[in-house]
Amino acid sequence: MSLDIAQIALHQLIKRDEQTLDMVLRDSLLPTNAAVEDMMAELHRVYSAKSKAYGLFNEQSELADALRACRKGDEDFLSFSRAATGRLRDELAKYPFAEGGIVLFCQYRYLAVEYLLISVLNSCNSMRVNEQLDISTTHYLDINHADIIARIDLTEWETNPESTRYLTFLKGRVGRKVSDFFMDFLAASEGLDTKAQNRGLLKAVDEYCDEAQLDKNERQNYRQQVHSYCTEQLQSGEEIELASLSQELPPLGEKTFQQFSADQGYELEESFPADRGTLRQLTKFAGSGGGISLNFDALLLGERIFWDPATDTLTIKGTPPNLRDQLQRRTSGGKQ
């Protein structure tokens, strides 16, 4: 699938000392060539593969106002990106962890959807070997570890301004403060709660099975069907569609799964992104804490694994061979 770049601008923030964050602003847009296209294709791929949070602009968002003006032609894209970089610098300077980076603004189209992607990318040093086998230093953009990224679905924003999901962003691997400053820069708030939607789906499935009075095996088979559908959607980059999921599932009683979900008021969207971690609970039990980490198939509960809620005791009958081998060697006096 091709990614068509409309406009792209690069600027730079440089941290001089603990108090100073300087800007280096380009005077022209970045020419679109093969290298730029490859970079954006990689950034799009990396971003699309990561779990994202959803949001929407606040009513007083300066960035949203400037973007509207840019879209109307009242301001050109370069001027918009330069002014936005200044606002980003001012916001970032409030935080003690502030670091510099390459600030990227790219308007592009992918699969008939128009996007604006904004990112702060780290510039890293590495070594290269030339044809004469000499070693020298080179610089590269660390796209694979980029975690300060937001993307605005311009098509959704302009055709459905009441949407709570036209803006997506990464919360960042180094803590909430990273996403906080970026959300402040965007003047946006969190919108659609993907995890809550997935948890609501699991609750609806369990209560649908309860109402049909399915036995343990029937219930788990039903949960497996839901998991298979959701996993296929996730792997293909598609969202969970309640209507199509309901068509995949055999009705239990007089109501389809979609009708049951609507009647019970789970407040599920017609479609929403799949959350891999939440959906895993359909087929597995997992948990960790106090030096213990457990993960097992749900079907094993009541067969090889038993839980006594009165004493909060888990009994496992038949340990995995590699675990059993370690236990035998340790208890027989072997030092591993």
From Swiss-Prot:
Residues 317-336 are annotated as: Disordered. It comes from the Bacteria. InterPro entries: Nucleoid_associated_NdpA (IPR007358). Its main location: cytoplasm. Keywords: Cytoplasm. GO terms for molecular function: double-stranded DNA binding; single-stranded RNA binding. One of its GO terms (cellular component) is cytoplasm. NCBIfam families: PRK00378.1. HAMAP family: NdpA (MF_00730). This is Nucleoid-associated protein ECA2747. It comes from Pectobacterium atrosepticum (strain SCRI 1043 / ATCC BAA-672).
